[in-house]
């Protein structure tokens, strides 16, 4: 994909050095969005290469596709469907092509890297219990190397329940985040989500409550997504 601006850059795109302006994180540049090999079988699939990975509601793993430069992943993704309604997913990722790319090193910093290298493992198990209930358990082990000492690496484990009953949609989710790999911090952060929705004559109404918590102490921080 390609991102090009028209006119002067009177904003901070995170690459142009215009730090006196507000951030619009859509830097100029061109990059290969996807390049992959894919195998499909009636019981699952496997994908190798640069690819989109969008899990669940994309709160933790997704493409951030509303930005001009979509986030994609370099690695392998395997999905297995051994039973009706059950999907088991595993991904190994060695590089994240972030929304701050392409990686031409213009004012590139650890805070907004074009590429995030590392060794990450994503595990996701989703089961459609009944038409009104889907249950998803997951663990995302992110070993990220863009900060010295592994300060952004984390392990997130959670459970999500969602569905619709009598036209009312709902979602309940809890996750816990701790340090992982070489992260020297002592993380213990919680995530909560509750949503209710209803559609009236094609208009969707939704109310939600979301908490990204953090524990006390100098070695902790807020829940990261």
Protein language model annotation of sequence segments:
Residues 1-35, 46, 53-68, 147, ...:
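Surface-exposed loop and membrane-interface regions of Gram-negative outer-membrane beta-barrel proteins
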Residues 1-5, 41-43, 50-55, 92-96, ...:
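Transmembrane beta-strands of outer-membrane beta-barrel pores
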Residues 7-13, 58-66, 99-112, 116, ...:
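Outer-membrane beta-barrel translocator domains and adjoining extracellular loop/strand segments
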Residues 9-25, 169, 173-225:
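Extracellular/periplasmic loop regions
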Residues 28-33, 70-74, 117-121, 153-157, ...:
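Residues that define the transmembrane beta-barrel architecture of outer-membrane proteins
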Residues 34-39, 76-80, 123-127, 159-163, ...:
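Residues on the lipid-exposed face of transmembrane beta-strands in outer-membrane beta-barrel proteins
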Residues 43-47, 84-90, 131-137, 167-172, ...:
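Repeated loop/turn-to-beta-strand initiation elements of outer-membrane beta-barrel proteins
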Residues 44-51, 152-191:
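Surface-exposed extracellular loop regions of Gram-negative outer-membrane beta-barrel proteins
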């Amino acid at each position: 994909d390609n991102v090009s601006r028209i006119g002067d850059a009177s904003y901070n795109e995170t690459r142009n050095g215009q730090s006196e302006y507000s951030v619009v994180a859509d830097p100029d540049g061109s990059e290969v969005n996807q390049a992959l090999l894919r195998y499909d079988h009636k019981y699952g699939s496997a994908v190798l290469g640069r690819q989109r990975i969008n899990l669940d509601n994309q709160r933790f793993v997704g493409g951030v596709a509303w930005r001009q430069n979509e986030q994609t992943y370099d690695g392998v993704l395997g999905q297995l469907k051994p039973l009706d309604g059950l999907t088991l997913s595993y991904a190994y990722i060695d590089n994240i092509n972030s929304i701050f790319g392409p990686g031409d090193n213009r004012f590139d910093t650890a805070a907004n890297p074009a590429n995030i290298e590392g060794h990450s493992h994503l595990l996701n198990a989703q089961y459609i219990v009944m038409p009104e209930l889907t249950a998803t358990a997951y663990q995302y082990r992110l070993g990220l190397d863009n900060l010295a000492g592994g300060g952004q690496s984390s392990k997130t484990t959670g459970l999500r329940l969602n569905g619709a009953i009598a036209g009312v949609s709902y979602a309940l989710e809890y996750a816990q985040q701790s340090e992982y790999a070489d992260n020297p911090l002592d993380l213990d952060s919680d995530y909560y989500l509750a949503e209710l929705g209803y559609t009236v004559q094609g208009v969707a109404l939704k109310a939600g409550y979301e908490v990204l918590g953090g524990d006390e102490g100098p070695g902790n921080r807020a829940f990261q997504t």
